[in-house]
Amino acid sequence: MPEFLEDPSVLTKDKLKSELVANNVTLPAGEQRKDVYVQLYLQHLTARNRPPLAAGANSKGPPDFSSDEEREPTPVLGSGASVGRGRGAVGRKATKKTDKPRPEDKDDLDVTELSNEELLEQLVRYGVNPGPIVGTTRKLYEKKLLKLREQGAESRSSTPLPTVSSSAENTRQNGSNDSDRYSDNDEDSKIELKLEKREPLKGRAKTPVTLKQRRIEHNQSYSEAGVTETEWTSGSSKGGPLQALTRESTRGSRRTPRRRVEPSQHFRVDGAVISESTPIAETIKASSNDSLVANRLTGNFKHASSILPITEFSDITRRTPKKPLTRAEVGEKTEERRVERDILKEMFPYEASTPTGISASCRRPIKGAAGRPLELSDFRMEESFSSKYVPKYVPLADVKSEKTKKGRSVPMWIKMLLFALVAGFLFLVYQAMETNQGNPFTNFLQDTKISN
């Protein structure tokens, strides 16, 4: 007959189940704790070891009374002697370990005096899987260990301890304390996680409300005092909310000058108001010391009907709300714009000025396509070709001078007639002159007289 253990708490939960099933013991329905299987093992299996021992004692004679501690070292011979020896040795070791007083049971244990290794062992005993214990994480693990010890003390005080009658039940009770290590019970760790999650949530819940209130107050009042107050009060909150609040304050300061811009600050330069255009030119001369640019600017003022509408001046004041723009600064900005336009005109003198800055010329018609007749002018470059396109971009005075030159040109037959008249006049003058010996035509004249 096999011998069963007096202390089945040494076995694991699965081993207990297999032993009970092998010995035809009915298991309770559902998943139970280890203590339930230990009690079943003691009731059904460990109880089988006692009747043979009692019968043997009665047959021998008077019973030999001895304690359980003296009975454990004596090996019991039988069919399962070798198995019994191994299991008995394991049981003896377990009872010796559990009989020792544990450091966690001491109430006067100081957590701060423990070393890192001892602190790690204490946390492992409570079923916590800690990480590396360093100087920064030690305080956190000490607090965690204190919480676990407090919870363990509360659970011990709330649950009444059962009365134990025999030494076997003593060993079973001692072993049942360790049964939590091998069970799947993680109630302590779950409670601990909930406590850790609640602490940061309480701290974070208040910040969005205050930020929202501050933003509403900031949007309602655009004063500088309100902006500084929101920045100072939101300085305690770190990270993104502070940056978002400061961005809102800067946007608010940029929006404020829109209400301050009045039509009286805009400069209107046209034919009706001339007194304001001349001081602008004077300030430009004084600030830039460039008479050429100033002359160009005044010329542009004369030709333009309306320069820089009101919206442009309001945009300038919106971009720089810190100080109001003076007439000199506005003049300098308009000067820069005009100078850029003049430079473009100097680079491209024959380009037409368009609002978009893109100019296009008309395309010459394609001859020979769509039934159009071919002309000789299409294959020969003439002066009229250049005069068709270039005069469009030439100033008005140059066009007038070219027209006058074309009107003075004289036809060829008139030129030949004038040349003949001048030649005949010269011949008559020559004939009217006195005869002279040095005349080269004297011999010719004498021959004509003789022939007559």
Curated annotation (Swiss-Prot):
Record region (Nucleoplasmic): 1-409
GO biological process entries: nuclear membrane reassembly; regulation of DNA-templated transcription
One Gene Ontology cellular component annotation held by this UniProt entry: nucleus
Biased composition annotated in UniProt, kind: Basic and acidic residues: 96-105, 178-202
Gene3D superfamilies: 1.10.720.40
Lumenal side: 431-452
Subcellular location: Nucleus inner membrane; Chromosome
Region spans: Disordered: 48-113, 149-264
Gene Ontology MF, one: lamin binding
Keywords: Acetylation, Chromosome, DNA-binding, Membrane, Methylation, Nucleus, Phosphoprotein, Signal-anchor, Transmembrane, Transmembrane helix
Family stated for the protein in its record: Belongs to the LEM family.
UniProt-recorded name of the protein: Lamina-associated polypeptide 2, isoform beta
